[in-house]
């Protein structure tokens, strides 16, 4: 008996050194090194043929490790930049850092011993703060680069460099010369814990703040002429009732504001609730207040709000009289009494009313939040600690307290110290938004906002905002370049002085303000003009720092342009950087600094909760990349998985992340990787120059596949063009699994492995594989940049491009688009799904092992479909084009089209409906040793008795 021949070496199995595993911790840094050594980003951003494209970086704060918000933000930016580079744009990205401000100052102070703090001069503090900011910036920069983010990392912008600070002084100077900068005593958000003014963007409003609210009565002393008639009968024992959630502001009370259009009532209380028998409240609130005070209030008289104007009352705690005045539309009947206690030194609306009536700005509180001597008996008490208690007690003793109750509401806290803030009037520098508000609102309309509701967020913020307080009482920042006349305290701020300081900062940096004398900082004409000056010690709000970046970076660097194409940050920046940049740019140039603004949400855990140390649900981006201490619990996934997560979520709202989500993403990455590996392995002997099959010679299956490739990558392109990266994620994942792995590649194995290497049947398939592989690599490159490059480096044939990024974007030929093929092939694929289901039943019962053990019986009622199927079912496996056949489509050895559904009914394994019947029976003939198909021709060939007719022909180079 002769030994059976082995045909193992005659089969064309895949060959590639492309690793099945990503091994990201080792491989990603190698690929990043390859990009750096070959200067891929630099070359493309410099030499691409298209327009310059600028996504301007909103600077992260240089004061700690990166969190998931940073990862989301920087990766989104990088996806856009890489896509634009692939599309031929000169995408130039300069990463930036916000380096000044209180948070860094606090970090430095916290790291020092008490003794060190006592010896601290502003200059020493600034040097320590600079060192801290620079070391943090370096760490963050390395992390961002490990994410795979491209940019000009050698020349980032830092808000602490001399060129930046000088440009910022330039913006300030232009605004000052246009009359938009002024000094005023105004109430501002003041943080006693930081001892400085704060901007709106530096506040947060935590849940669950409870204030001690009080209803109090101020005795009326004189009725206005228009109210005399109504009030006179009650004047002897009449008060005006107010409500406040900040009793500590009562020493600053200089008026009571009302709404002129409301009706007010003089009420009498059923039982005594204060020393007055009668008091005035809004008529609409009588019933509500009766319940609050737990006594019936009887209406004795009513009058219009406007008639009460100029009625006077006495302050219950101080020896002074004030008037009832007309307030704004903030005086409502939603809460309180319909009459608002007004302290112009402690509130924005109060201040505006006070200005209208010429009231002084009284703010008897110092920078630590303690009452000054102006608060009389309350001097020395802290307004956030013991002042409320003392004031409420005093109101009670004077018979002026109606009721005290806890009130839960949103209250502003210092975003860094996490402690409550107050409104306090101080001498500050302001940017007058009023001067250019309309231009700013017009500019907003000319910007594209993605998502569109961004416009609806920023518009009311700009429309309703007060003037911008830009001064801070801290050392670590850019100084406001103002001098004061020692004698008159008049500020000196003009073109000459500003330009002189700007030139000094450009050369020496803003430390010069502390290092140089007043004489050196002043231009020549002011040095000996008979006046003595001192320099101001306020620094600028850090939002003015970052808000000047368009001027310091985009406008100043020759390789960039202004206005820039895109700003992209979190949705909280409508009140922050988007707005400060808009205001400075509009004030100086009349235009927005950006053409488009994209916003993303916040990162939450898998349960949709905010990340916090106390819950212990913080996900660290570096941990995702490099893994944790326990690699079983926290494996190292690499940067691509992090980037894939960014593309998988709808970033326009808040987005979740956690271990379960990451595991799913690893699966998706691996599926894409394995698909690419199969494609690479089966192209090992393909030379595109000589082996490519012309389109007109391709089997219909291949032409259908090229049509699907066109559909898929057109949709991917549209996803990137519209910044809907989650669509890219869904489409590519679906393409790899449904179109390639489960369909085309499944069918292709027979052609690729069994046919003669040079046969058209095989080369036509490889022609499609090459198109699929290259377009897959290019399309994932903006997101899975490391995987895409890894694939490209293992291409088995010559390519003129050393990097996938040099190869540009996906390439699709117009002739590949054949929508007319879709209906027929969709039907074929549906039938295939049905066949697979029945195969599975037969396999489960062990009637068949592989699908090649089966013959498929098929009944269709539709005449046209029957004809299509007939044309795909030749009687002879060596005729036709040997590709467009049902047996290959179904991965079966034979297919019979039957004329009657009864034939299907007789089989054990079947699926029947009115229009389609599928049955699985044993295949005819013997199993071929080489291709494992069953054939009635096995045994016919003397030299190869165990082979079928296809393999016999293949070995002769004919199949």
From Swiss-Prot:
Binding site for ATP: 613
Pfam family for this entry, one: zf-FPG_IleRS
Renumbered ranges of motif 'HIGH' region: 60-70
Catalytic activity, reaction form: tRNA(Ile) + L-isoleucine + ATP = L-isoleucyl-tRNA(Ile) + AMP + diphosphate
Top-level class of the enzyme under EC nomenclature: ligase
GO BP term, example: isoleucyl-tRNA aminoacylation
InterPro entries, sorted: aa-tRNA-synth_I_CS (IPR001412), aa-tRNA-synth_Ia (IPR002300), Anticodon_Ile_BEm (IPR033708), Ile-tRNA-ligase (IPR002301), Ile-tRNA-ligase_type1 (IPR023585), Ile-tRNA_ligase (IPR050081), M/V/L/I-tRNA-synth_anticd-bd (IPR013155), Rossmann-like_a/b/a_fold (IPR014729)
An MF annotation (GO) of this entry: aminoacyl-tRNA deacylase activity
The protein's Enzyme Commission number: 6.1.1.5
GO cellular component: cytoplasm
Binding site for L-isoleucyl-5'-AMP: 569
Localization of this protein: Cytoplasm
Keywords from the named record: Aminoacyl-tRNA synthetase, ATP-binding, Cytoplasm, Ligase, Metal-binding, Nucleotide-binding, Protein biosynthesis, Zinc
Sequence motif 'KMSKS' region, residues: 610-614
Cofactor: Zn(2+)
CC cofactor note: Binds 1 zinc ion per subunit.
Gene3D superfamilies: 1.10.730.20, HUPs, Ile-tRNA synthetase CP2 domain-like
PROSITE patterns: AA_TRNA_LIGASE_I
Binding site for Zn(2+): 928, 931, 948, 951
Function of the molecule: Catalyzes the attachment of isoleucine to tRNA(Ile). As IleRS can inadvertently accommodate and process structurally similar amino acids such as valine, to avoid such errors it has two additional distinct tRNA(Ile)-dependent editing activities. One activity is designated as 'pretransfer' editing and involves the hydrolysis of activated Val-AMP. The other activity is designated 'posttransfer' editing and involves deacylation of mischarged Val-tRNA(Ile).
Family statement drawn from the similarity comment of this UniProt entry: Belongs to the class-I aminoacyl-tRNA synthetase family. IleS type 1 subfamily.
Subunit composition and interactions: Monomer.
Domain remarks: IleRS has two distinct active sites: one for aminoacylation and one for editing. The misactivated valine is translocated from the active site to the editing site, which sterically excludes the correctly activated isoleucine. The single editing site contains two valyl binding pockets, one specific for each substrate (Val-AMP or Val-tRNA(Ile)).
Protein name per Swiss-Prot or TrEMBL: Isoleucine--tRNA ligase
Lineage: Bacteria, Bacillati, Cyanobacteriota, Cyanophyceae, Oscillatoriophycideae
């Amino acid at each position: 008996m002769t030994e059976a021949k082995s045909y193992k070496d005659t089969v064309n199995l895949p060959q590639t050194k492309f690793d099945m595993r990503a091994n990201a911790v080792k491989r990603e840094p190698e690929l990043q090194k390859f990009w750096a050594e070959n200067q891929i980003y630099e070359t493309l951003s410099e030499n691409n043929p298209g327009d310059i494209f600028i996504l301007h970086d909103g600077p992260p704060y240089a004061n700690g490790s990166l969190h998931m918000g940073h990862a989301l933000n920087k990766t989104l930016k990088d996806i856009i930049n890489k896509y634009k580079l692939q599309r031929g744009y000169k995408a130039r990205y300069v990463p930036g850092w916000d380096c000044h401000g209180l948070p860094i100052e606090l970090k430095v102070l916290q790291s020092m011993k008490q003794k060190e703090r006592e010896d601290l001069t502003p200059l020493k503090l600034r040097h320590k703060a600079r060192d801290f900011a620079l070391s943090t910036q370096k760490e963050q920069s390395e992390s961002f680069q490990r994410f795979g983010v491209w940019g000009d990392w050698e020349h980032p912008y830092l808000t602490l460099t001399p060129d930046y600070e000088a440009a910022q002084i330039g913006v300030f100077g232009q605004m000052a010369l246009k009359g938009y900068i002024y000094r005023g005593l105004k109430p501002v958000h003041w943080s006693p814990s930081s001892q400085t003014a704060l901007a709106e963007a530096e506040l947060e409003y935590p849940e669950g703040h409870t204030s001690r609210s009080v209803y109090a009565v101020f005795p009326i002393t004189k009725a206005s002429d228009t109210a005399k008639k109504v009030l006179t009968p009650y004047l002897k024992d009449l008060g005006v009732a107010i409500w406040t959630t900040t009793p500590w502001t009562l020493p600053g009370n200089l008026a009571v504001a009302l709404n002129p259009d409301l009706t007010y009532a003089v009420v009498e209380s059923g039982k005594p609730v204060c020393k007055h028998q009668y008091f005035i409240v809004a008529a609409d609130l009588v019933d509500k207040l009766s319940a609050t005070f737990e006594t019936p209030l009887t209406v004795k008289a009513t009058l219009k709000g406007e008639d009460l104007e100029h009625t006077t009352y006495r302050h219950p705690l101080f020896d002074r009289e004030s008037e009832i005045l007309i307030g704004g539309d903030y005086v409502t009947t939603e809460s309180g009494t319909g009459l608002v206690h007004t302290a112009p030194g402690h509130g924005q609306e109060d201040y505006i009313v006070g200005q209208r009536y010429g009231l002084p700005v009284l703010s008897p509180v110092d920078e630590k939040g303690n009452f000054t001597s102006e608060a009389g008996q309350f001097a020395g008490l802290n307004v956030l600690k013991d002042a409320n208690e003392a004031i409420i007690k005093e109101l009670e003793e004077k018979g002026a307290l109606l009721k005290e109750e806890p009130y839960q509401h949103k209250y502003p806290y210092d975003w860094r110290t996490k402690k409550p803030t107050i409104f306090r009037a101080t001498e500050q520098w302001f940017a007058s938004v009023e001067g250019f508000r309309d231009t700013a609102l017009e500019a907003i309309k000319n910007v594209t906002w993605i998502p569109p509701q961004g416009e609806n967020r920023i518009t009311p913020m700009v429309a309703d905002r007060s003037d911008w307080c830009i001064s801070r009482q801290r050392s670590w920042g850019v100084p406001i370049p103002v001098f004061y006349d020692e004698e008159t305290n008049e500020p000196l701020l003009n073109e000459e002085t500003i330009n002189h300081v700007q030139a000094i900062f450009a050369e020496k940096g803003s430390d010069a303000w502390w290092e140089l004398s007043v004489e050196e900082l002043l231009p020549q004409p002011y040095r000996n003009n008979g006046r003595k000056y001192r320099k101001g010690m306020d620094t600028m709000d850090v939002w003015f720092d970052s808000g000047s970046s368009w001027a310091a970076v985009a406008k100043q660097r020759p390789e960039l342009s202004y206005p820039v194409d895109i700003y992209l940050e979190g949705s909280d920046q409508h009140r922050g950087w988007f707005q400060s940049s808009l205001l400075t740019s509009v004030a100086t140039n009349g235009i927005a600094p950006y053409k488009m603004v994209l916003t993303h949400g916040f990162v939450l855990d898998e349960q949709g909760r905010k990340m916090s140390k106390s819950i212990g649900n913080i996900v660290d981006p570096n941990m995702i990349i490099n893994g944790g201490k326990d690699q079983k619990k926290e494996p190292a996934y690499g940067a691509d998985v992090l980037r894939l997560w960014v593309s998988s979520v709808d970033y326009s709202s808040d987005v979740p992340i956690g271990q379960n989500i990451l595991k799913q993403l690893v699966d998706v990455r691996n599926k894409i990787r394995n698909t690419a590996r199969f494609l690479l392995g089966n192209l090992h002997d393909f030379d595109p120059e000589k082996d490519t099959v012309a389109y007109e010679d391709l089997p219909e299956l291949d032409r259908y596949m090229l049509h699907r490739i066109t559909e898929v990558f057109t949709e991917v392109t549209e996803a990137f063009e519209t910044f809907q990266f989650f669509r890219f994620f869904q489409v590519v994942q679906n393409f790899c699994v449904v179109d390639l792995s489960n369909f085309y590649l499944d069918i292709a194995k027979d052609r690729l492995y069994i046919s003669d290497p040079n046969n058209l049947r095989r080369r036509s398939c490889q022609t499609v594989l090459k198109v699929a592989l290259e377009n897959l690599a290019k399309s994932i490159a903006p997101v899975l940049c490391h995987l895409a490059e890894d694939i490209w480096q293992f291409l088995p044939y010559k390519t003129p491009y050393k990097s996938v990024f040099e190869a540009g974007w996906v390439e699709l030929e117009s002739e590949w688009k054949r929508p007319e093929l879709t209906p027929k092939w969709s039907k074929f694929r549906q039938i295939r799904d049905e066949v697979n289901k029945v195969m599975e039943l037969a396999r489960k019962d062990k009637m068949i092992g592989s699908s090649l053990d089966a013959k498929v019986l098929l009944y269709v009622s539709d005449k046209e479909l029957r004809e299509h199927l007939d044309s795909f079912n030749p009687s002879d496996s060596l005729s036709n084009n040997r590709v467009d056949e049902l047996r290959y489509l179904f991965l079966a050895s034979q297919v019979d089209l039957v004329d009657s559904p009864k034939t299907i009914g007789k089989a054990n394994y079947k699926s029947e409906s009115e229009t389609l019947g599928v049955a699985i029976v044993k295949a005819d003939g013997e199993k071929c040793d080489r291709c494992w198909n069953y054939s009635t021709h096995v045994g016919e060939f003397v030299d190869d008795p165990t082979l079928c007719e296809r393999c016999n022909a293949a070995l002769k180079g004919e199949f």
